[in-house]
């Protein structure tokens, strides 16, 4: 990269980071690469699904950086990651020794969902370790963490990560023997083969895999299915002894799989156990920003933030809300989704689903102030002593995390402050939490008092 290209790209990243929320920037911009700038055309390498976001949101950024560095209007030519991967993969396929085709083992249908990848998985603090572990397993299956056990509530991305691991391994090695299956379907297959007296086929199918991906392993924890547990135990041992990768997901930790045999629980803990928790507000905004690319509607930022505040339990609720909105907007022939339109469209879903507790900002200010020895009135005022500033910024952070209020609304409740002040406080506290365990504990203590 030439000096001017480096300056241009640094400026693009700087402008993008100043305009986007951190989680949005991390997902849509962080992994993009400038390949070259030639004849006023910038060639940018990124995931194809992110092209529309760049076209909609970053055109002005590129134009600004172009005029600053080259004193010219810079256009963009996107090179997609998928195209390069396919090209590289085809080369690998062509290079495979012919004797691999003579493999005597029966073919296995992976049952992977090709739409799930690491590239389109939205990362946040609540899932960062799970993503990192999944990528490590995909890069070196059978060696790094075996088994990998991912647990968390429904709709948080466990199935997405399982499929992303499988798709990544398959992309690197098209001949890999991979199987994605739910524990329930494993049970069903076991029952069928028992009835047909074809257990040898089941054993051959599962014990010769390179990668086994089991979803919702808690379904195996049923006392009436001891025969199934025995078969899975033997399958696990056969794969693990041959350094074949096993990844499992569950809605609870291994120690809480109460009806599972102890010897299985022990093996589940041999490798690495990671947790996924519900996405925070900023991650929910990033998820929505990504998902709305699939719809032909305009979603203003205040609508996105409103929706992010309405559903705080899992990703499926967010996806379902967008489908509700799309249905209503298509029927009414609406192009722009305002907060009022979104609220009307999701009303039934909110009534049927779990209610998000309405927490007054005054309560957050009162509890935050009490913890740090200041009053709610002082938090709203302009005084800037150290303990008041910390209490104020923590309260702003919690107001954004625990309510569905927009940034301007939160700023108004803090003495009429600008929305940028709220955003600065939120980002500052979030960064401090990642580096200061004592502050994280303090904030969790305040949250528990508010709830």
UniProtKB/Swiss-Prot annotation:
Keywords: ATP-binding, Cytoplasm, DNA replication, DNA-binding, Lipid-binding, Nucleotide-binding
Protein family per UniProt: Belongs to the DnaA family.
Assembly information from the UniProt record: Oligomerizes as a right-handed, spiral filament on DNA at oriC.
UniProt-annotated binding residues for ATP: 155, 157-159
Domain note: Domain I is involved in oligomerization and binding regulators, domain II is flexibile and of varying length in different bacteria, domain III forms the AAA+ region, while domain IV binds dsDNA.
InterPro entries: AAA+_ATPase, Chromosome_initiator_DnaA, Chromosome_initiator_DnaA-like, Chromosome_initiator_DnaA_CS, DnaA_C, DnaA_dom, P-loop_NTPase, Trp_repressor/repl_initiator
Protein name: Chromosomal replication initiator protein DnaA
Positions of transmembrane segments: none
UniProt organism field: Streptococcus pyogenes serotype M49 (strain NZ131)
Region Domain I, interacts with DnaA modulators, annotated ranges: 1-77
Gene3D superfamilies (alphabetical): 1.10.1750.10, 1.10.8.60, P-loop containing nucleotide triphosphate hydrolases
Localization (cell): Cytoplasm
Encoding gene (name): dnaA
Function recorded in the entry: Plays an essential role in the initiation and regulation of chromosomal replication. ATP-DnaA binds to the origin of replication (oriC) to initiate formation of the DNA replication initiation complex once per cell cycle. Binds the DnaA box (a 9 base pair repeat at the origin) and separates the double-stranded (ds)DNA. Forms a right-handed helical filament on oriC DNA; dsDNA binds to the exterior of the filament while single-stranded (ss)DNA is stabiized in the filament's interior.
Chain spans, region Domain III, AAA+ region: 111-329
Positions of region (Domain IV, binds dsDNA): 330-451
Region (Domain II): 77-110
GO cellular component terms, semicolon-separated: cytoplasm; plasma membrane
NCBIfam families for this protein: DnaA (TIGR00362)
Main location (coarse class): cytoplasm
GO molecular function terms attached to this record: ATP binding; ATP hydrolysis activity; DNA replication origin binding; lipid binding
Biological process, per Gene Ontology: DNA replication initiation; regulation of DNA replication
SUPFAM superfamilies, per the entry: P-loop containing nucleoside triphosphate hydrolases, TrpR-like
